[in-house]
């Protein structure tokens, strides 16, 4: 079935608490990710009843030794010295058919020693959101954790109202977080911190092993992955919503989809999370927050760099100072590709910023605009439409494309690789959740998943999911749930 290993347990009991999932009354398989199951070599012959027992936590597989991981974190800028998995159980690690190692984690699987009075459960809505959103992000080409299954529990959970309960099975390259490092750094446990860093290097950056400056290079690599991740978020219009350090993956993957949402009309100040009152995690602020989170990681690494704290700071500071310029280079290159620019010139940054300014002023939809610009290269009616919306800018952009001398079909191919036809629109996600909460069915979710798994292709049903809601998400809010 699944051959579990448990390498994280070898770090020692300071890193986790042993914890078993709490059995549920009547597990039922709601969603199953067949392509991912095939990648993980899960036998096809297992029936839904058996899968529901396993991925509800009711039945443990041989070799699985569940734990709740310990970590701390900065939440909205304030440090909390102990958080940990309060409603999740790491079942262990498995290798897929290509030899890649994955964590297998249940969320909503019952209370742990880190629950802080919570029930350890998850409502079906947030579980469904994470499944749909993570699959959409994967198809869009964004580094992300993924969901293998959603199992309903047959039990109610009590939130703002009484809701059906569910357990979601998440896989990730690891669940190592900035907050994991903060947990030990805050306690001054430098030996444990070194073990953790060595383990993370072994798991994610093995090429650094043995280097005399491996911990400096480690920070550099993590920063690089974060820059790549945030750039991908900006490319597709993803707003994470809760970029706390305990939600910052050292593997450079999107994790913890709780209050996430997708950008509609372009505005860098857009926030949908109900708890982000000060707009700390607004769409346009995500790179700055990532830099802030990397600074927190750097602080944890200081005792591993040099016994003299000031010297350690001097060694790491250049990486943090360079973050903004480094991000901007990657971001501008990505935005250039969205506009079909095969090689950037100094003047192109102004071209990019001018378009974003125009989108903001005109309250134009981010995804639709780039989709239509892509289509305009082979459709005169769409070109005329975009010229009407963008005015002189459209002609300026077309002149720049002609100037670079690249065949327009090649340009359009480049643009389509960057610009999806559709994204997981907030109102479609909410409709799928509402259907499931009210009827227990996932018809809308399955139809939505079908098109979201091909975001760069024009399927028969694609047009049904492209348009933003009539109110432009004006009053839309998201809430933490999983």
From Swiss-Prot:
Residues that, per the record, bind Mg(2+)? 247, 256
Q: Which InterPro entries match?
A: SelO
Sorted alphabetically, the keyword list is: ATP-binding, Magnesium, Manganese, Metal-binding, Nucleotide-binding, Nucleotidyltransferase, Transferase
The reply on keyword Transferase is: yes
Which cysteines are disulphide-bonded?
Answer: none
Enzyme active site? 246 (proton acceptor)
Name the family: Belongs to the SELO family.
Q: What is known about what this protein does?
A: Nucleotidyltransferase involved in the post-translational modification of proteins. It can catalyze the addition of adenosine monophosphate (AMP) or uridine monophosphate (UMP) to a protein, resulting in modifications known as AMPylation and UMPylation.
**Protein name (database record):** Protein nucleotidyltransferase YdiU
Q: Name its species.
A: Desulfotalea psychrophila (strain LSv54 / DSM 12343)
Show the taxonomic lineage: Bacteria, Pseudomonadati, Thermodesulfobacteriota, Desulfobulbia, Desulfobulbales
């Amino acid at each position: 079935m699944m051959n579990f290993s448990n390498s994280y347990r070898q770090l020692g009991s300071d890193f986790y608490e042993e914890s078993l999932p709490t059995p549920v009354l009547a597990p039922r398989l709601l969603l199953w990710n067949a392509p991912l199951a095939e990648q993980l070599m899960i036998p096809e012959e297992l029936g839904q009843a058996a899968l529901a027992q396993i991925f509800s936590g009711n039945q443990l597989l041989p070799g699985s030794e569940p734990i709740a991981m310990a970590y701390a974190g900065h939440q909205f800028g304030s440090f909390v010295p102990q958080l940990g998995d309060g409603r999740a159980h790491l079942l262990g690690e498995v290798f897929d058919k290509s030899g890649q190692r994955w964590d297998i984690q249940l969320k909503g699987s019952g209370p742990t020693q880190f629950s802080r009075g919570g029930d350890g459960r998850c409502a079906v809505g947030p579980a469904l959101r994470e499944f749909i959103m993570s699959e959409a992000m994967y198809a869009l080409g964004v580094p992300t954790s993924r969901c293998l299954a959603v199992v309903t529990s047959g039990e109610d959970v009590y939130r703002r109202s009484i809701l059906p309960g569910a357990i979601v099975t998440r896989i990730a390259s690891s669940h190592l977080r900035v907050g994991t490092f903060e947990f030990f750094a805050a306690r001054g446990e430098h030996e444990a911190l070194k073990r953790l860093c060595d383990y993370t290097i072994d798991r994610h950056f093995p090429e650094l092993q043995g280097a005399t400056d491996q911990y400096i290079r480690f920070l550099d690599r993590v920063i690089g992955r974060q820059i790549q991740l945030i750039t991908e978020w900006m490319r597709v219009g993803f707003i994470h919503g809760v970029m706390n350090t305990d939600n910052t993956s050292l593997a450079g993957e999107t994790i913890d989809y709780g209050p996430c949402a997708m950008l509609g009309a372009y505005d860098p100040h857009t926030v949908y999370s109900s708890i982000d009152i000060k707009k700390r995690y607004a769409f346009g602020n995500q790179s700055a927050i990532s830099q802030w989170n990397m600074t927190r990681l750097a602080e944890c690494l200081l005792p591993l760099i040099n016994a003299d704290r000031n010297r350690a700071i001097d060694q790491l500071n250049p990486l943090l100072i360079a973050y903004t310029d480094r991000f901007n280079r990657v971001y501008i290159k990505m935005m250039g590709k969205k506009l079909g620019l095969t090689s950037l010139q100094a003047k192109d940054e102004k071209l990019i910023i001018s378009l974003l300014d125009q989108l903001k002023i005109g309250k134009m939809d981010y995804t639709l605009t780039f989709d239509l610009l892509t289509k305009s290269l082979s459709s005169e009616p769409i070109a005329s439409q975009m010229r009407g919306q963008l005015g002189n800018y459209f002609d300026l952009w077309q002149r720049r494309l002609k100037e670079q001398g690249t065949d327009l079909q090649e340009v359009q191919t480049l643009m389509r690789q960057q610009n999806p036809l559709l994204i997981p629109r907030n109102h479609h996600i909410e409709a799928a959740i509402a259907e499931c909460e009210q009827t227990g069915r996932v018809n809308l979710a399955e139809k939505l998943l079908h098109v979201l798994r091909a975001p760069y292709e024009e399927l028969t049903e694609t047009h049904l999911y492209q348009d933003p809601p009539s109110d432009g998400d004006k009053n839309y809010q998201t809430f933490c749930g999983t």
